[in-house]
Amino acid sequence: MSFVKYLRRDNLLQLAGKPSLSRNYILQTCRTLIIETSPPEFVKLNRLSGSDSGIIEVNLDRPVTKNAINKEMLKSLQNAFESIHQDNSARVVMIRSLVPGVFCAGADLKERRTMSPSEVHTYVNSLRYMFSFIEALSIPTIAAIEGAALGGGLEMALACDLRICGENAVFGLPETGLAIIPGAGGTQRLSRLVGRSVSKELIFTGRKIDAIEAANKGLVNICVTAGEAHEKAIEMAQQINEKGPLAIKMAKKAIDEGIETNMASGLEVEEMCYQKLLNTQDRLEGLAAFAEKRKPLYTGN
């Protein structure tokens, strides 16, 4: 199975036989990102069932390195999200850590020391494309953060639509202290989320911030008692899962594509997304359920 990379583009293109993933990314085979063998299970998928069917947990589990992402863990991430992309029943994705006290410590710097500049270039590009893949999923993504989310770990959380953290969470992009910069989307996504000035301060200084400051700056959506981020993320995923799945996809598309352009163009995107929902069975089901004062049963059609 081959992984994919994204190239920036103004117009939307459709991947043959698959739904478009995002506003201005196109999929292209990337030879440098071929998954050659089954990697160790550093990333484990958990598909919830029953009334929670459609919610998928992506569990990070590399305790020896505090979930630092080496080549093998990156392959595990690629496998996991390729599987989610292929799953038509997926409605909400949540990324969490199974390692107590840490979300993700970033890249594996011990492995990095053994790499040539060319190998580092390939690895960082692969990580950047991986996080762009997460961002470009048509369904909502939630990061449930306990403990440290540093470097590439924070960049992974930034690629998600929503972030929920425990009070014990710590955030930072310390790369300038290593004479490099955040290379997996941090300079771009952080700036778009918290603003240019705050982003520059955090990246220039490499300063770590706690959960309360992160919430005040808008870096996270919700801060809860330590140890309760997963529970809160499940609650939010359940709320999303109850809504019309096509509507959720179109809402994400309208917001993500519209925010990158001017108001007039953004309203055109909104109109296009709304139009796509008018002839769906789910829209009729929503109206019928409202009239009959019952819970709607959405099928994604």
From Swiss-Prot:
What are the alphabetically sorted keywords of the record? Answer: Fatty acid metabolism, Hydrolase, Lipid metabolism, Lyase, Mitochondrion, Protease, Transit peptide
What is one GO biological process annotated to this record?
Answer: fatty acid beta-oxidation
Site (Important for catalytic activity) at: 175
Pfam families in UniProt: ECH_1
Q: Where is the transit peptide?
A: 1-32
Reactions catalysed according to its record: a (3S)-3-hydroxyacyl-CoA = a (2E)-enoyl-CoA + H2O; a 4-saturated-(3S)-3-hydroxyacyl-CoA = a (3E)-enoyl-CoA + H2O
User: What is the top-level taxon of the source organism?
Assistant: Eukaryota
The protein's location, in the record's own words, is: Mitochondrion
| Gene Ontology cellular-component annotations | cytosol; mitochondrion
Q: Identify the EC number(s).
A: 4.2.1.17
Q: What is its main location?
A: mitochondrion
Q: Where does substrate bind?
A: 105-109, 152
What's one GO MF term for it? enoyl-CoA hydratase activity
Q: What does this protein do?
A: Straight-chain enoyl-CoA thioesters from C4 up to at least C16 are processed, although with decreasing catalytic rate.
Instruction: Tell me its family.
Output: Belongs to the enoyl-CoA hydratase/isomerase family.
**What's the protein here called?**
Probable enoyl-CoA hydratase 2, mitochondrial
